[in-house]
């Protein structure tokens, strides 16, 4: 297991259970006590957890792990969702994407569509995610519109009054919205961070 994967697994445990003990890390991840301590120290240095005697607890000021740690979680499912979503996109379409790991994968799959080869008929992509805008801006067949706003460090999304001012003047044909959860009524949840 790579260092990144260990850190992601430890963050998952802490987010799900509220805390983790070094013995749990040793047992669950099959690492030495020294490796478990180093991993917790690294995550504490990044302010993702708060160290305790023999373990760590969730950082009370951080309710959402950074995007780089959420990317590998359920990667196969995200790829399947992304491929299905990208199949709905055609040259000339106007689409919207918010930030998140799944919508980042959707953007990557859109960029790989064989039908998007004519720069004269680009897809217009509206996003509030600077990481998605960065990846897509170099694509000749994608025109990128960024909403503006204040950057959220953990998700790379632009939010706030500036984004709220521009959104009413933008129209998209298809919106791919990444959320944290969905209930049986279709209501969604999203981190506020």
Summary of predicted features, one role per range:
Residues 2-25, 29-34, 44-45, 77, ...:
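Conserved phosphate- and dinucleotide-binding cores of soluble alpha/beta proteins
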Residues 57-58, 102-105, 132-133, 182-184:
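Short, active-site-adjacent cap segments at secondary-structure transitions
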Residues 2-7, 15-23, 27-30, 34-101, ...:
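HTH-adjacent hinge/linker in prokaryotic transcriptional regulators
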């Amino acid at each position: 297991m790579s260092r990144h994967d260990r850190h992601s697994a430890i963050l998952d445990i802490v987010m799900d259970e509220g805390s983790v003990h070094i013995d749990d890390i040793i047992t669950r991840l099959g690492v030495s006590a020294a490796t478990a301590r180093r991993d917790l120290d690294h995550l504490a240095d990044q302010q993702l957890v708060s160290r305790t005697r023999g373990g760590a607890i969730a950082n009370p000021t951080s309710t959402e792990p950074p995007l780089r740690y959420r990317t590998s979680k359920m990667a196969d499912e995200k790829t399947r969702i992304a491929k299905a979503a990208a199949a709905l996109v055609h040259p000339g379409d106007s689409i919207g994407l918010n930030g998140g790991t799944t919508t980042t994968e959707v953007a990557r799959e859109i960029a790989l569509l064989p039908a998007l080869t004519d720069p004269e008929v680009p897809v217009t992509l509206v996003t509030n995610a600077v990481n998605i805008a960065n990846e897509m801006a170099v694509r000749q067949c994608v025109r990128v519109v960024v909403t503006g706003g204040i950057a959220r460090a953990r998700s790379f999304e632009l939010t706030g009054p500036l984004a709220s001012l521009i959104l009413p003047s933008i129209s998209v044909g298809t919106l791919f919205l990444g959320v944290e959860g969905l209930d049986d009524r279709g209501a969604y949840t999203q981190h506020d961070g």
